[in-house]
């Protein structure tokens, strides 16, 4: 674990549901923990602005960084821009317990540097096709938690949900996963429980 607040990296391809997950986690945890968010976009701060519009956290607890080029570089090879944003948030809010770091959309090979994230969540999209879990990739196989999002779309895109979960189980082995519909809140309780358990947040998140 890094020093200071727990850092959770949220990765996945474009459109998989990373910002939706970030928003839902803020809604679920902001009343129980002191938390903040860092978003990564290639040339804009659109994801940060979306979170501000949703008012899931005060604006001064959200930082948007523009990575330029390949978004995976800013979360793996050279995480300095994200580390600077984290340092800024920690100075502004010394009581921080949790920081969510949302990566820019990338491919199945994107991973977070251990210098940047204590835990990683990887989000994939059911609508991207039946074979996504079978394609493996570090995001699918090595993340601390895999979230298979938009399972409600399976019948509309020719995906067999039973086979999708079986393939996910094979790809993950002993590592946990959640079948989710993030926009509708399905699976959020399981993801929150994972963060509390694996991130050592039990006492901090206990109801007052």
From Swiss-Prot:
Pfam families in alphabetical order: cobW
| UniProt keywords, alphabetically | Chaperone, Cytoplasm, GTP-binding, Nickel insertion, Nucleotide-binding
Which GO cellular component terms, listed alphabetically, does the Swiss-Prot or TrEMBL entry include? cytoplasm
Q: Detail which positions bind GTP.
A: 12-19
UniProt keyword annotation of Cytoplasm present: yes
A GO molecular function annotation here is: nickel cation binding
GO biological process terms on file: urea catabolic process
Q: Where in the cell is it found?
A: Cytoplasm
Q: What range does the record give for the signal peptide?
A: none
Q: Which family does it belong to?
A: Belongs to the SIMIBI class G3E GTPase family. UreG subfamily.
Q: Which PANTHER family match?
A: UREASE ACCESSORY PROTEIN G
**What NCBIfam families has UniProt attached to this entry?**
ureG
Summary of the function given for this chain in its UniProt record: Facilitates the functional incorporation of the urease nickel metallocenter. This process requires GTP hydrolysis, probably effectuated by UreG.
Q: How does it assemble?
A: Homodimer. UreD, UreF and UreG form a complex that acts as a GTP-hydrolysis-dependent molecular chaperone, activating the urease apoprotein by helping to assemble the nickel containing metallocenter of UreC. The UreE protein probably delivers the nickel.
Could you identify this protein by its name?
A: Urease accessory protein UreG
Say which species the protein is native to: Rhodobacter capsulatus (Rhodopseudomonas capsulata)
């Amino acid at each position: 674990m890094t020093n200071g607040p727990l850092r959770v990296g949220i990765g996945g391809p474009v459109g998989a549901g990373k910002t939706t997950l970030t928003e839902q986690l803020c809604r679920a945890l902001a009343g129980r923990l002191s938390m903040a968010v860092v978003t990564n976009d290639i040339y804009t701060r659109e994801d940060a602005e979306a979170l501000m519009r949703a008012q899931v956290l005060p604006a001064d607890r959200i930082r948007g960084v523009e990575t330029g080029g390949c978004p995976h570089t800013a979360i793996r090879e050279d995480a300095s821009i994200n580390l600077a944003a984290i340092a800024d948030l920690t100075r502004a809010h010394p009581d921080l317990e949790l920081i969510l770091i949302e990566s820019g959309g990338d491919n199945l090979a994107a991973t977070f540097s251990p210098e940047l994230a204590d835990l990683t969540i990887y989000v994939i999209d059911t609508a991207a096709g039946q074979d996504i879990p079978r394609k493996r990739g570090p995001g699918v196989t090595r993340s601390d938690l895999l979230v298979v999002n938009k399972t409600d779309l399976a019948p509309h895109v020719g995906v067999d949900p039973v086979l999708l979960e079986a393939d996910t189980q094979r790809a993950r082995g002993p590592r946990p996963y959640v079948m989710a519909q993030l926009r509708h809140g399905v699976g959020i309780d399981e993801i929150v429980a994972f963060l509390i358990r694996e991130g050592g947040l039990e006492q901090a998140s206990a109801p007052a």
